[in-house]
Amino acid sequence: MKSDIQIARDIELQRIEQIAESIDLPVEQLEPYGRYTAKVPLSCIDEEKVKKGNLILVTAITPNKAGVGKTTVSIGLALGLNHIGKKAIVALREPSLGPCFGMKGGAAGGGYAQVLPMENINLHFTGDFHAVTSAHNMITALLENYIYQNRNTCDGLSEILWKRVLDVNDRSLRNAVTGLGTISDGIPRQTGFDITPASEIMAILCLAKDFEDLRSRLENILLGYTKEGAPFTVKDLGIAGSIAVLLKDAIKPNLVQTTEHTPAFVHGGPFANIAHGCNSILATKMALSFGEYAVTEAGFGADLGAEKFLDIKCREMGVAPKLTVLVATLRALKLHGGVAETEIKAPNAEALRRGLSNLDRHIYNLKKFGQQVIVAFNRFDTDEEEEISIVREHCIGQNVGFAVNNAFAEGGKGAEELAKLVVEMVENKPSQPLKYAYEPENPVKMKIEKIAKEIYSAGSVVYSSKADGKLKKIAMQSLDHLPVCIAKTQYSFSSDPKAKGDVRGFELKVSDIIINRGAGMLVVIIGEIMRMPGLPKEPQAVHIDIVDGFIEGLS
């Protein structure tokens, strides 16, 4: 089979005006970025259609390091729905350069289920990540200037919380000292970098309802504390307008197309392990405004991305999924059955059966939210029918819908079984009204423990002295009502990435809580999770090149 980039290159793309016309989106509203991409103004969102639309969430079991193909399934499902005569649009996150050149590679789908032009989408795209990075670091520069200019006055700060960001994986930037040199070079202090998808600006971009809401959220960003212990925000710095200007175009969703010319809105890119892991509310609303079905995904496993999608994004958006599709693969299931990562491609029915406990946990958890769940088996070319049957029979025994997705190899035709099952369930057995894992009035510790014990099956939750200190500051600022966004490893229900399967009864340690006042959530750091990833021994970057003007090795 051809490589992803070869397949993408062989597709004859339609001009973006044709894609817009296919969903009755007025062409004169488009703000083109070349021939095949356009920004769409927020005025195109139809709130009445948003409320009536069929939102489909795609999530997954706990993944292996290479992932389970959730984006490919999301795109494939949209292709499949269009293949059977339904009007479907997919809404996805934008890829980050960190993983693209790091371990996982790109995030534009795979095979014959991709969003295009994949090279542009995987690289700089429309500059949204650059805008977020620039806005974040502009705040840092202006904050540093404020500190410098007020170094000899009573207006100084006693504690600074705001870091810098870059869209790269670079472990050496996790901790840094700035302001070295002479006094004219700034005030020395210890700080660090996060990756751009973990930026509070990214979260704000993805949760904002409109430009006014974006600006309001920017004003509320907590930067540090004064010498009197009062919160110091972007509003106090007086720069919200300047930062909003940097994001005036980034807030608009991006319209592209798939390998079969299905419309796709690709916008925003927070990770689900260290942030809330969902594409923008505005892009999802745009998909609901123009499609009969809107397919979207939430990052990593359902314990992370789906929980945050339902508890944070849906609460903000006021819309819930009619159905949740849970992606599973033989490889990930065998990993949870005790097989080493290097051996998961080989047949092993016994390990597969053991690994089904991880699938069952995710199904059970999603049903707690009132979600109707079906399992999408993402097929690889090495998968054996006998082992696929084991998973199918198990799901049937659990009274859970099951469909094989082969969109990677066959495009929309390969997702026909999945698409038909989705339509059947939405029309006859849709999800119940959404049941949140916690309520806003619950104390912060109760919110954390409800997720830890009800979703992760932790035995107990312990707090570091640093986390306890943050809880006091949260109470002092009356921020207890905010939702919690758990930052932990994506490879296990626990904080130990090596603990596979249906792990239970463990201790979950809260090491820190980051107050995202602007985004409107509390980021709860579990264990030693890093908000600036590192690179593997052999990063994807060594395989990427440009030959005769064509990019090679991007996947």
Curated annotation (Swiss-Prot):
Documented EC number(s): 6.3.4.3
Catalysis performed (reactions): (6S)-5,6,7,8-tetrahydrofolate + formate + ATP = (6R)-10-formyltetrahydrofolate + ADP + phosphate
PROSITE patterns: FTHFS_1, FTHFS_2
Superkingdom of this protein's organism: Bacteria
Protein name per UniProt: Formate--tetrahydrofolate ligase
UniProt keyword list: ATP-binding, Ligase, Nucleotide-binding, One-carbon metabolism
InterPro entries in alphabetical order: Formate_THF_ligase, Formate_THF_ligase_CS, P-loop_NTPase
Name of the top EC class for this enzyme: ligase
Pathway entry: One-carbon metabolism; tetrahydrofolate interconversion
Molecular function per GO: ATP binding; formate-tetrahydrofolate ligase activity
Family to which this protein belongs: Belongs to the formate--tetrahydrofolate ligase family.
Gene Ontology biological-process annotations: tetrahydrofolate interconversion
Stored NCBIfam families: PRK13505.1
